[in-house]
Amino acid sequence: MNKLVLVGHPGSKYQIVEHFLKEIGMNSPNYSTSNKISPEYITASLCQFYQTPEVNDVVDEREFSAVQVSTMWDSMVLELMMNNLNNKLWGWADPSIIFFLDFWKNIDKSIKFIMIYDHPKYNLMRSVNNAPLSLNINNSVDNWIAYNKRLLDFFLENKERCVLINFEAFQSNKKNIIKPLS
């Protein structure tokens, strides 16, 4: 059973990487049968319980520091894992996992992380196109820097379990993404 956690800034187009992985064989997780628990539900519950800020609102990298998660949450994850025992390759993507990377890393030593980043100019262009006129460009850039610094720090501390993907490079050479995951 291989488990992949995809994490990337909301502007990184991480969903396209997730879609590609599903096309080549990664399954979505089976939700727990009793409570319909999904990885996204677990992350949303953790965000609510630990009162994490909205990912796009963070401009100080310290706000992306790892949240120390209580063991009381382990049973939810165990239920999710048990419902995916027969799932050979499964995974999901969620930008809010940035707060809980250490939690997922420690709860299951076999989880692999795919970390997706994009050039900040693309994030800024998307922000300008989708935001009101009062957009603070500095906040958008600071948010991108803070998020991707946490992503890079985690990658550097856990290279044996992580693949770092530049979205532009991925677009031009998708097939090579599966080599580091083998």
Regions from the language model: what does each represent?
Residues 1-73:
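PAPS-dependent sulfotransferase catalytic core
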Residues 51-55, 78-182:
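PAPS-dependent sulfotransferase catalytic domain
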